[in-house]
């Protein structure tokens, strides 16, 4: 599939070929749902923790006699029914991550890229070699494209990252870090020609 090649000023500089095995695959949205859930589960810190009956500070003595008081029998003041007692089956520190097949993850990336291409939300850039040092300069380049948010994929200089860092609707990412959640979370995906070649090697 032929696609036009532009620079960050949105001027045509040529054409490039997009592989239909990446940008024109069957749309299976359930795959995207599975992968986003997997990504969000992996990023959870899992540091939630409450004290159980064995963690609560307090005496181990029986509160009062088993019989003759007329009250319900109790064996510990650290039981959950008492104020300051432990929590039963409460959250503990754990990992929420689970495994997902590599084939599924790879196919999901193709589905996400195909979805963006189908909606005309993929732009192929010749490179990111621009001399910008200020956010205002980066903003002028971005305003050449009529989208609400941008994910720029390619090898970039630190100066470009610093210039774009303060724009909440612009994110830069290396080709190796491209993922389904970020693709779906941005309206427009900008790929450099080098990033495109890398993705072909990664996904085919």
Swiss-Prot record:
GO terms for biological process: translation. Residues 56-67 have a biased composition (Polar residues). InterPro entries: Ribosomal_uL4, Ribosomal_uL4-like, Ribosomal_uL4_dom_sf. Residues 53-77 are annotated as: Disordered. It comes from the Bacteria. Pfam families: Ribosomal_L4. One of its GO terms (cellular component) is ribosome. SUPFAM superfamilies: Ribosomal protein L4 (SSF52166). GO terms for molecular function: rRNA binding; structural constituent of ribosome. Keywords: Ribonucleoprotein, Ribosomal protein, RNA-binding, rRNA-binding. One of the primary rRNA binding proteins, this protein initially binds near the 5'-end of the 23S rRNA. It is important during the early stages of 50S assembly. It makes multiple contacts with different domains of the 23S rRNA in the assembled 50S subunit and ribosome. Forms part of the polypeptide exit tunnel. NCBIfam families: rplD_bact. Belongs to the universal ribosomal protein uL4 family. PANTHER family: 50S RIBOSOMAL PROTEIN L4, LARGE RIBOSOMAL SUBUNIT PROTEIN UL4M. This is Large ribosomal subunit protein uL4. It comes from Wolbachia sp. subsp. Brugia malayi (strain TRS).
């Amino acid at each position: 599939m032929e696609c036009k090649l532009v620079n960050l000023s949105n001027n045509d500089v040529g054409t490039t070929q997009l592989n239909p095995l990446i940008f024109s695959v069957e749309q299976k949205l359930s795959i995207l749902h599975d992968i986003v859930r997997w990504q969000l589960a992996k990023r959870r810190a899992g540091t939630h923790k409450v004290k159980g009956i064995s963690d609560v500070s307090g005496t181990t003595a029986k509160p009062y006699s088993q019989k003759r008081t007329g009250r319900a029998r109790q064996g510990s003041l650290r039981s959950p029914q008492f104020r300051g007692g432990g929590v039963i089956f409460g959250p503990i520190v754990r990992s929420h991550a689970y495994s997902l097949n590599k084939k599924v993850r790879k196919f999901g990336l193709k589905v996400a890229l195909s979805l963006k291409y189908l909606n005309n939300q993929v732009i192929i850039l010749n490179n990111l070699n621009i001399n910008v040092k200020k956010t205002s300069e980066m903003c002028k380049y971005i305003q050449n494209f009529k989208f609400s948010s941008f994910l720029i994929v390619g090898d970039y200089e630190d100066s470009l990252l610093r210039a774009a860092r303060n724009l909440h609707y612009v994110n830069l990412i290396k080709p190796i870090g491209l993922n389904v959640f970020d693709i779906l979370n941005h309206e427009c995906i900008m790929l450099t020609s080098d990033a495109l070649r890398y993705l072909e090697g990664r996904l085919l």
